[in-house]
């Protein structure tokens, strides 16, 4: 039932979710999670909201929500959108480094590579912001 699926709470709003998995990058209070409203209201759109790893998953929902809100506020302003993308990468990497704290932990490099891929995907979807 599609309607029931949209009524489910996302993992980051679940009271049982572990805050440390978000690395201090929280979903802003004003964020509206509603995929029926489009890509700016569904966390990480067509990508997983978490970096899956043995043990603890790094939760990117906060970073994606902040990026969604930034784009919604500044859509059409190329310079502002580039700043949104830069902050997005920083937030994703912050989550990775907070969740996987040892440089020797292979999950850290995997998470950082995933963060870079998410950033590159966003840039690829909006090339006009970069090539003007």
Where are these regions (language model features)?
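Extended terminal accessory/targeting regions
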Residues: 1-132
